[in-house]
Amino acid sequence: MPKYRSATTTHGRNMAGARALWRATGMTDSDFGKPIIAVVNSFTQFVPGHVHLRDLGKLVAEQIEASGGVAKEFNTIAVDDGIAMGHGGMLYSLPSRELIADSVEYMVNAHCADAMVCISNCDKITPGMLMASLRLNIPVIFVSGGPMEAGKTKLSDKIIKLDLVDAMIQGADPKVSDDQSNQVERSACPTCGSCSGMFTANSMNCLTEALGLSQPGNGSLLATHADRKQLFLNAGKRIVELTKRYYEQNDESALPRNIASKAAFENAMTLDIAMGGSTNTVLHLLAAAQEAEIDFTMSDIDKLSRKVPQLCKVAPSTQKYHMEDVHRAGGVLGILGELDRAGLLNRNVKNVLGLTLPQTLEQYDITVTQDEAVKKMFRAGPAGIRTTQAFSQDCRWDSLDDDRAAGCIRSLEYAYSKDGGLAVLYGNFAENGCIVKTAGVDDSILKFTGPAKVYESQDDAVEAILGGKVVEGDVVVIRYEGPKGGPGMQEMLYPTSFLKSMGLGKACALITDGRFSGGTSGLSIGHVSPEAASGGTIALIEDGDTIAIDIPNRSIQLQLSEAEIAARREAQEARGDKAWTPKNRQRQVSFALRAYASLATSADKGAVRDKSKLGG
């Protein structure tokens, strides 16, 4: 029978000092012996996805206390990728994932907490907390802040839905008037919550459902809706049950590594492919799997991508649907239900509610459930009122979207495409693979061949695109932007958005060892591995070289002879200390970022730290 971890600090005469300090936080004699549960919040006023979280930790804590536990809250940092985008701030985004994971480990282990409730939401916060949870392997429940409502505005006498990406594209399009750009900017992000499309934040919050570590509805129920409050209340109650099951009944099924098993990771990736999630999810699932000591690799993702169809299409891949529409169609469980009927899921998995996948679908799949409360929850909709307050409205759709032939979520028979929304490509300059969000690629450019235009920074590429130096048919290559080379593996949302604003969204390709925002669409291929700074062949591409992309056949090729590539590699090595570094880039890199770069691995490994360099 495992002992409560917290007993280390609450029991024994020699722990009098620790108990004295616990008493100063409000604990009393009756609390010593109860499980101490960390409420890991991520409130910040910098990020709309987190601006409403200040009081939500208190909601969880009250339920923990009422259920027989002791709640202790702390905060992590949270970077807003959209605000950090397009300047040096983006260098810090991915490294913040590691800082978040470490800070959770530090706080939980330093104070011997027994379990956690993780209140996350945006791009690197959910992955960082997920990595920490699987590293620590103590009972945990995730509950995120929820998606933002889609923006709406009237253009050309037509009401259209908007999101952050629309504001970026219109702001860079010289054909758009200042008045229209301003109108879109003011309408794009109307409420608190994670940006309203199937971007990285919402993708990851959906994946925690598929992993079994969060409750049904977590990924899609709007931040503003009153129904979301119940997820927080339930999390506080349920975590005490999970904690007591493990520590008092020796039930290891309550631990995250036994919930988020290899089978659960495969289900999560299957969901990701079917819903056309952000390419960043690949990076984060690979990293989380390593923390869980699960053998889950790019090869597994490649195999899944070849058999899973696309059953859901959401912004940025279409403007018709946003997360509020996914929720109306049944959310994550709606997609999982269709995947299950197609025989594409591992059914022998459980979630934090203790339900197997078939049991969960029976209760929460809107096409089969008899539970009217569940149907009501999935009718939760937007109010269209600007607010930063959680649970501030109770609007509902008149009906559910259960049309699996022409609705937001489709059945296998009516899939958007037989190929899924993500694909792994391999070739002679991506020997370890690269990732493309096929959900956002127009059918006309699934096969694309063109001359390379090579840039050694995102900034140079943006200048060239806006300056008209990139033309129809070009393959833009942005290198030395990987985890080590950036450092920090910047997102390339601005280059892809600016290609669209210049009318080149379906006429060019963009390839990088960096990564893309979940808001990216178009022929945007990232995570090229090995990266340029690690000796990757992408560093040897020159202007004018022909690159051939063949998504249906999962191929990407630099059309040069092996002899020519070998000669260029030899010339690169001859640069000595300057080999595998950008030639003409001026970039200030802080000590913190240099420390990150010194241990960073390529994207095919999840851009985690290289344990072998630390003797691990």
Swiss-Prot record:
Residue ranges the record marks as coiled coil: none
Q: Where does Mg(2+) bind?
A: D81, D123, K124, E491
Please give the biological process terms from Gene Ontology that the record holds: isoleucine biosynthetic process; L-valine biosynthetic process
EC annotation from Swiss-Prot or TrEMBL: 4.2.1.9
Which co-factors does it depend on?
[2Fe-2S] cluster; Mg(2+)
Write the record's keywords in alphabetical order, separated by commas. Answer: 2Fe-2S, Amino-acid biosynthesis, Branched-chain amino acid biosynthesis, Iron, Iron-sulfur, Lyase, Magnesium, Metal-binding
Entry binding sites for [2Fe-2S] cluster = C122, C195
**Keyword Chloroplast on this protein?**
no
Q: Cytoplasm: is it a keyword of this entry? A: no
Name positions with the PTM N6-carboxylysine: K124
The catalysed reaction is: (2R)-2,3-dihydroxy-3-methylbutanoate = 3-methyl-2-oxobutanoate + H2O; (2R,3R)-2,3-dihydroxy-3-methylpentanoate = (S)-3-methyl-2-oxopentanoate + H2O
Q: How does this protein assemble?
A: Homodimer.
Q: Which HAMAP family match?
A: IlvD
- Supply the name of the protein: Dihydroxy-acid dehydratase
- Organism name: Salmonella typhimurium (strain LT2 / SGSC1412 / ATCC 700720)
